[in-house]
Amino acid sequence: MNIFDIMGPVMVGPSSSHTAGAARIGYIGRKLLGFQPAKADIGLHGSFAATGAGHGTDRAIVAGLLGMAPDDPRIPFSLQLAKEAGLEVSVHPVTLRDAHPNTALMTLTGSRGRTVTVSASSLGGGRIRVNSIDGLEAAFSGDLPTLVIRGRDEPGVVSEV
């Protein structure tokens, strides 16, 4: 732990968990899809759902999906910017079993139909943890370069490598 963990990240507020962490969750979702999504279905769990609109959690996640950093001054306008960019957004409460209270479940769809479903939690101070990708357990923060490989588990695939 260092002084920046205590002070919190440089960000557009009001909350390091509900705004900065949420923006990072959206950004990681974008990176896992590989490009800006055309459609985003965003489920907010626990305190994300209870106070998300007031803390700008919805706007922060969408800002991350648009490629914005947690300190981007455009975050408060991200829902309008998403509309202008052709990104269809749906935000709703969701109940997730045994999940951290600041968890988002996003299903992101690209313009050519590629999808990725990401569950991630905001841990405080702008820190996040990715919990699952397409239903498979994961545990990484995105602070360091992380390689995610998708493969087909069927006979003969390894011989093609």
Where are the model-predicted features located?
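Contiguous domain-boundary segments centered on the initiation and propagation of an alpha-helix
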Residues: 66-112
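Short, hydrophobic/aliphatic alpha-helical segments
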Residues: 1-11, 40-43
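Broad gene-expression machinery/nucleic-acid interaction feature
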Residues: 39, 86, 101-105, 115-117, ...
